[in-house]
Amino acid sequence: MGFVYENAELSIIAAAGQDENYGLPGVDATPRKAQLAAEIGNVRVLSSMRHPHSSIRSSKWSTRGWTFQEAMLSRRRLVFTEEQVYFECNAMNCYESVSIPLDKLHVKNKSKQRGCFRAGVFGRNGKEAFGRLDLNTLTIYRVFVRYLAAIEEYSARELRYDMDSLDALIGVTRKFERVRHSYLHIWGLPYPSSVESGKARDYFANSLTWVHTQDCWDSIAKPRRRAGLPSWSWSGWAGKVSLPLHTDSGDDKLWFHNETAAISFECESEKILEFAQMVQHPSIETAHSSSPRVLILQTPVVPSSAFSYDS
């Protein structure tokens, strides 16, 4: 479906209701909320209604794992919310309840929206204020940041079947495989494919620094293990994860200094594959159903006697 979204002229998104049977508000028999108005003398005051970004983020559609690639990969999106219609492409966004001439929204050559207007909602997150997925103009590090930011956002979504954890993201992972600084992944943990294996290993080690955002001791909200997927990957857990991404330093350096001496994987046959072998033969890991599930790290050991605490 990733190729379908990327090449479609327009994606119609139903961000209203709780299931696929709800329909599109304002179309046929599906009602939508009326725009409130008041007249004071000869002045008519209209409600601008709830901002569509808020409506989209709080919709059932935004909680579903399979719709993430629809949001991220589509070139043009026409979104139906409970109140109004919202449009967003990779250059601008506008919505029905506020009428602004398009000439005033755009820069002089009409190539993009003026920077003073609010950025779009798709692809935008706490680490990337403007979510345009123009990956070919980015450095190898910035592509890595965008990849991990996408993982963070996707991990907060829900899936009916645990084994869909990576399948529902396959359109996005293939997008990152085709850019100038190409990235592959092992169980959802990315590394650059266009560099020597030692540097690729450093990036992979940084991918391993993900953490749960929910308290593991909270009996209700704690992360849940996904059967059949490795525990060392975010894909092996249901629940939002976070990565310590540095996006505002202006320095394209990895934030985690890798002291790992070696990274390898153990297959079901007990055969050991070095990380360099995985990089040299990417077909080994692209079919994740048969990928090695055991991760082996060789690292320096810090003895417990090196730590002290105030009792």
Where are these regions (language model features)?
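Feature captures the RNA virus RNA-dependent RNA polymerase
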Residues: 1-311
